[in-house]
Amino acid sequence: MKRLILAAMLAAGMSGAAHADDALKAAIANSERASANVARDGARHPYETLTFFGIKPTMTVVELSPGGGWYTEILAPYLREKGKLIAAGESPTSAREGARKYAANLTKKLESKPAMFDKVQRGVFEVPTTYDFAKPGTADLVVTFRNIHNWTGNGDEKVKEIFRKVHESLKPGGVFGVVEHRAPAGKEPKADSGYVQEAYVIKMAESAGFKLAGKSEVNANPKDKADHNKGVWALPPVLANKDVDREKYLAIGESDRMTLKFVKQ
C-alpha cells in the first residue's frame, strides 16, 4: 500500500507546474514520512510555506542545513522526477567531529528510503567556513528553516557572507525562502535564545543584494512572547525544561516564526 501511495505521489509530481499544488499536497500526505514529523504539520504549515516561496516540481532547490530531514521528506519526492533537491549540510570529511556526525546521520536518513531519497544530491554548507552547495546561478530556490540563529554567533560579517553565497547560487529572479524564530520587534534577543529579529534578517539579506518580495504570517504564533527560560527550546517539540511549566509551554505551542521571501534581482 505504501508503494502505491508513493507511486501516486510521484505521478502527481510529473503532471507539471499547472498541478504543482496537487503534487505538493501529495508529497505532504506521503505515508513514508515519519509519523513524528507528520504530527508537526499543524505547527510548521509546509504546504502554505512552500507555496508562499513559489516552489514548483521542476525547480532546482537547495535546502540549507536539513537537520533531521523534516522538510527533506517533503521536498525529495516532490522534486524527484522533474526537479532537483540539493541537501546542503556538514561535510562527511569535516575537521570537526560534530559536523561529521551530522553528515553521517543525514547519510543514514537518505539511505534508509531509496524510493524517496535516491535522487537527492549532497552539498556542503558548514558554517562558518565552507559553502560548496551549488554552482553560481543554478538554483531556483534556496530554503532555510530555523537556522539563522545558528549563524549569528559568528558575527555579522559571517552572516553577510552566507547571504552572499546564497545570492550567488541563485538564478536571476531566484528566491531565498527563510523561516526563523522571531524575536519581538525592538527587543534584542539573548544570543543563546534561538530568536532573531526580523529586521536583522532583512538587513542581512538586503546587504547581499536581495529584495524583500513578501512576508507571510502563516508560521506566526502570538502566544509566544520569546521570554522563556532556556529560550525557544523551552517550547515544543524540545520542552527543554522538562516537567517545569510543561503545561504552560504546551499551551503556547511552537515558536512564533517569521516567514520571508527574498528575490535575487
Language-model features and meaning:
Residues 247-265:
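C-terminal lobe and adjacent flexible extensions of AdoMet/dcAdoMet transferase-like proteins
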Residues 117-120, 131-142:
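A short acidic, Gly/Pro-enriched loop at the edge of an enzyme's catalytic core
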Residues 56-67:
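Conserved class I S-adenosyl-L-methionine
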Residues 58, 81-82, 170-176:
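Short glycine-dipeptide loop
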Residues 129, 139-160:
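A short SAM/SAH-binding and catalytic strip from SAM-dependent methyltransferases
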